[in-house]
Amino acid sequence: MDVIQPRVFNDPIHGSVELPPLLVKIIDTPQFQRLRNIKQLGGNSYVYPGANHTRFEHSIGVAYLAGELVKALRERQPELKITERDVLCVQIAGLCHDLGHGPFSHLYDGMFIPQMQRRRKDQDSSWKHETASVKMFDHMVKENKLDEEMKKDQEFNKELNSPDISDDMLKEKIKKDLEFIKDLINPEISDEEKKAFTGRGEDKSFLYDIVANKRNGIDVDKWDYFARDCHYLGMKNSFDYRRLILSARVCEWKGRNEICFRDKELFNLYDMFYTRFSLHRRAYQHKTGNIIERMITEAFVKANEYIQIKGSRGQTFNLLTAKDDMEAYTKLTDNVFEQILNDDNQNMREAKEILGKILKRNLYKCLGEFPSKRSEDEIKKIKAQVALPGGTKQDDFVVATSKLDYGKKEKDPIEEVRFYRKSDPNKAITLTREEVSYLLPGNFEERLIRIYRKRTNDQTVENDRQYFKKFKSIHNEFSGPQPAE
């Protein structure tokens, strides 16, 4: 194979981005190129004309930011002994963290799969795109012999150029690096279990928080998609990730090395969490975008059994089962929308009609929305109690819930963030609400209920209005206990 040079990408968010040869080799695989055909914001591209960016460019952005942060820590704190292998592993994890997304991104794992599981009374809810990313990463390494490329990569192995390193020892180190990368992609593990990580020791536990931070949500994945999504949605982004990179330090907190930030960056971090809330409120949970995604999901459910995707060993898979075979899953992208739309199979007729309505903007009509603290089960019971207008049935109405928060449900996310002061940069501290401001929100989570009517016209307006009023009235009087504040 020809020697691959570093490649410079002209990114609209980060400018000229140079990635090392090993990452270029990963980018030039079918498994990664698949991300060009998966929209970052799913059905919202039918609401916001500019929101057609994909998981491909987002993943390149995350790889770049992962490198920027870990290199800044290495330069600022040589005592951390961050190696070039560490840097490249973190960058590879950033590049590959979204390999497991299905058609229209979160629509597939957040709406389609749960709906299919309910229809099949399947209680297994363990599948998520992060676990699929790990499986796709394994598949990509195997299909493209990337472990061999890692062995040959001079930059990756510059610290191992020693006659004392045997081929078997090098293989073992690369095996450990691959496990490390997968742990970085999907770090669903408690602090107590961090000792069991095979990739890196406890002294480098902070590396697990760079790409996907399950502890407090501050990670380079969010930094990229906040900036990128705001850009393509045409929204302002007040959060400045560059300031955080400049102030980031690793300090010990309760026996664990964590990435901490200067105390004066607290309001920049609140801007970050508010940006998340605002993007969900204005875009990700947009009332029209949400119903378009529900309509696409309905079409996918109806078309599921008739989609045939060839996978490993000559087997065929459908929309749901393709996720269990990475060869088939590599072929499953947003293009399934057009596949359904252009299929002449009569079994696809209902699915085609739904997708056709989206293109003609004949969408389900939003009758209204209001805040709620009721659970999903309570909302279902309320819907069953609402008297239906004449000539309608329950399926004519869609009751949708949207949850909005700062990233830690009802909790203040800053409670999980560690800071340091200029006077003592090696001591991790927490900041209390009293030290911050009396103007911070008292509640960090809300739930919205939206009611839609599938078929509506001038004659149904009054009935639709009455249905919404009845639903809201029964909701407010429902005998079930409201959750505590």
Map each language-model feature to its residues.
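Sequence-structural signature of the catalytic-core scaffold of metal-dependent phosphohydrolases
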Residues: 1-92, 100-370
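Terminal helices and disordered tails flanking the catalytic cores of nucleotide-processing hydrolases
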Residues: 283, 288, 297, 307-485
